[in-house]
Amino acid sequence: MAEKVVLAYSGGLDTSIIIPWLKENYGYEVIAMVADVGQGEELEPLREKAIKSGAAKIYIEDVKEEFVRDFVFPMLKAGAVYENKYLLGTSVARPLIAKKLVEIAEKEGAVAVAHGATGKGNDQVRFELTVKALNPDLKIIAPWREWEIKSREDAIDYAEKRGIPVPVTKKQPYSMDRNLWHLSHEGGILEDPAVEPPEDVLLLTNPPEKAPDQPEYVEIEFVKGEPVAVNGEKLSPVELIFKLNELGGKHGIGIADMVENRLVGMKSRGVYETPGGTILTFAHRELESLTLDRQTMHFKQMVALKYAELIYDGLWFTPLREALEAFVDKTQETVTGKVRVKLYKGNIYPAGITSPYSLYVKDLATFGEDNLYNQKDAEGFINLFGLPLKVRAMTQKPYQK
């Protein structure tokens, strides 16, 4: 009996041709695994496609709730954004997909797992670090690092010779990754950062110039940093993100066109659509501005930077990320309230924040007289706060330039 390998399968170009390749080159029995992270497409047809491509069995795992609850919301609460733009939609999904890959491999008694990430990208690292963290005994096969196929055109030719249909053409070889948090676009004409993305690239989001001429107000309610309702309607985590994707996409929210620094050492250009995630990130920051004290907020901003790097680099299942999550959860104990935003032609504007834990005291902030703040006290504060500067100026000796 042949040994088994579990393949992270999407039905796209790369994983479609990996099934016959694994059988031809390793002699493995191939078990395909599809993780439903909210791709927005019907996944059942992949059963027939995987079997026709040579798979012995296929699992289709609905992990949308787990994805949002255990991965997206912790990232949102941390405020993790990579290089000021990227809301980590692909990055944060990979550890969950790899986790399911390991679980099915253990269930099936497989000796190996395989993925379709290329040898130039970040995903190979994210998949494999997760596998190493969860089951280091599993062999990892990355065909893109082994086979003779060197381009997407070669891959298309390989598929056509074996009668495998793929949703890619040689004229427009965009690489897309979609889940309920975002949609990414890479490859083709997008590889030239001097070229504006064609309008037909956008699938979730209206171009801002085609968005409605009237703004729309949206109210989001948070409890301990997690969104729970939109416009007063309580929603499940998955329903909430789908709802905000619809609203944000209509108004051209969440389009990020960026050149990023890949973990593997090169720069790459990608176009990301994250309408709901962009609204949530904005609203969450607004609420934190009302409920977090200055020192906690500033330190949390440093944590957010590191948290984003850990996610981007595939280090989700690490002691450091788990420790940072514990810190973040502590900061979120008072991040409860409602945030009202205005959506208009690609922009989000704050339109009101309320919280039972608000640290904003109007009497302190006003420029008028009050009984809580004596403006004369400021002189002593400035003298003490500025003492190091004064001492340095008094003791500094002239030096030659």
From Swiss-Prot:
Pfam families: Arginosuc_syn_C, Arginosuc_synth. Pathway: Amino-acid biosynthesis; L-arginine biosynthesis; L-arginine from L-ornithine and carbamoyl phosphate: step 2/3. One of its GO terms (cellular component) is cytoplasm. ATP binds at residues 8-16, 35, 116. CDD domains: ASS. InterPro entries: Arginosuc_syn_C, Arginosuc_syn_N, Arginosuc_synth, Arginosuc_synth_CS, Arginosuc_synth_type_1_subfam, AS_cat/multimer_dom_body, Rossmann-like_a/b/a_fold. L-citrulline binds at residues 86, 91, 122, 126, 175, 184, 260, 272. Signal peptide: none annotated. Its EC number is 6.3.4.5. It is found in: Cytoplasm. L-aspartate binds at residues 118, 122-123. One of its GO terms (biological process) is L-arginine biosynthetic process. It catalyses: L-citrulline + L-aspartate + ATP = 2-(N(omega)-L-arginino)succinate + AMP + diphosphate + H(+). The keyword Signal does not apply. It is an enzyme of class 6 (ligase). The keyword Nucleotide-binding applies. GO terms for molecular function: argininosuccinate synthase activity; ATP binding. Keywords: Amino-acid biosynthesis, Arginine biosynthesis, ATP-binding, Cytoplasm, Ligase, Nucleotide-binding. It comes from the Bacteria. Belongs to the argininosuccinate synthase family. Type 1 subfamily. Homotetramer. PANTHER family: ARGININOSUCCINATE SYNTHASE. This is Argininosuccinate synthase. The gene is argG.
